């Protein structure tokens, strides 16, 4: 490990341990602790339960006939389910959340169906409350997709070039750290002890050594530090902003190349069943190789550029929005 890598590792570890030590040494002001994290006074057997389910269905259609300006007819559908379970007792807290999304775009003119969204994610946190100092927490997080993804050639999916599928990749994070809630709308989880596993359970994809696994291997395991920051803010009566930031640094290999996952959702509620949603997701993982530049057909033997890069997804949709609790 060269000096630059060692310096980056020490800086990241120092930040983790500094956040850990500061949170243990400095109690959270009682005025800023959330009602959820405040121990129930009186009955030692008192507990707090909360369950919430959000269902969103968004649809759009473009129909063109003899349209002089040109264009293509299309129809798209995106369905999302978000579920949250919260349990709080005097000494323990347990939070679980599930996020599922799937979207398709149909172009009838060329009989093409494209996938526009695909996400399966489950995360759970079990914490032992430390008096006035947050919670000592174990976290487990899993993320994958449902349907195969294909390479796109000239705007068309090539079904002979599968680039991803269920559990290829799949990501599992297991972490032990301190969970803090400095304000009513903010959570911070700092874990100096974290295991991150990447699974590629498709033989054809693992043989290519995709997503950081060695060619022919089906899994890759990393040890490092992990930080998760969450925010859910009621901006106005009808506008909600939710954000999440995950950071992971591999202690043993290129610790300065931090994996980033961040998700932002702005929801504008029109009425009890209609809403507009603006979503932005950004991912950076040095182990995921992307086509940064297509080969130039005018240059013989040009391989193009392949390497790590920023993955970006943006969604603007209007549709049905239902909430159950």
List where the protein language model places each region.
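Cleavable N-terminal export/targeting peptides
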Residues: 1-46, 325
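Outer-membrane beta-barrel channels and translocator barrels
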Residues: 86-90, 127-133, 183-185, 232-238, ...
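Transmembrane beta-strands of outer-membrane beta-barrel pores
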Residues: 57-63, 89-91, 100-106, 142-148, ...
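Outer-membrane beta-barrel "beta-signal"
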Residues: 266, 310-325
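Extracellular loop and loop/strand-boundary signature of outer-membrane beta-barrel proteins
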Residues: 65-71, 106-112, 157-164, 212-217, ...
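Transmembrane beta-strands of outer-membrane beta-barrel proteins
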Residues: 51-55, 94-98, 136-140, 172, ...
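Residues that define the transmembrane beta-barrel architecture of outer-membrane proteins
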Residues: 73-79, 116-120, 168-172, 219-225, ...
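Outer-membrane beta-barrel translocator domains and adjoining extracellular loop/strand segments
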Residues: 64-69, 108-112, 149-156, 200-207, ...
């Amino acid at each position: 490990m060269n000096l630059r890598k060692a310096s980056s590792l020490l800086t990241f570890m120092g930040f983790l341990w500094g956040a850990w030590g500061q949170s243990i040494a400095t109690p959270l002001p009682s005025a800023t602790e959330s009602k959820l994290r405040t121990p129930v006074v009186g009955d030692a057997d008192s507990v707090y339960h909360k369950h919430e389910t959000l269902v969103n269905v968004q649809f759009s259609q473009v129909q063109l006939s003899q349209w002089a300006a040109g264009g293509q007819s299309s129809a798209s559908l995106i369905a999302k389910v978000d579920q949250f379970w919260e349990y709080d007792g005097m000494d323990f807290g347990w939070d679980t959340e599930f996020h599922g999304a799937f979207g398709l775009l149909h172009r009838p003119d060329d009989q093409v169906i494209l996938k526009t969204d695909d996400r399966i994610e489950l995360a759970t946190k079990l914490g032992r409350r430390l008096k006035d100092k947050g919670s000592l927490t174990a976290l487990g997080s899993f993320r994958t997709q449902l349907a195969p993804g294909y390479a796109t050639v000239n705007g068309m999916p090539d079904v002979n070039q599968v680039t991803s599928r269920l559990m290829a990749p799949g990501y599992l994070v297991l972490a032990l750290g301190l969970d803090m809630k400095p304000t009513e709308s903010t959570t911070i989880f700092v874990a100096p002890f974290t295991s991150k596993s990447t699974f590629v359970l498709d033989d054809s994809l693992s043989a290519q050594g995709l997503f950081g696994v060695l060619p022919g291997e089906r899994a890759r395991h990393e040890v490092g530090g992990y930080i998760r920051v969450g925010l859910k803010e009621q901006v106005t009566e009808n506008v909600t902003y939710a954000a999440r930031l995950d950071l992971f640094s591999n202690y043993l290999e290129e610790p300065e190349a931090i994996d980033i996952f961040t998700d932002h959702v702005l929801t504008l509620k029109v009425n009890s069943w209609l809403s507009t949603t603006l979503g932005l997701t950004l991912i950076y993982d040095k182990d995921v190789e992307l086509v940064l530049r297509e080969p130039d057909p005018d240059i013989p033997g040009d391989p193009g550029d392949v390497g790590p890069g920023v993955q970006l997804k943006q969604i603007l949709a209007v549709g049905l929005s239902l909430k159950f609790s």
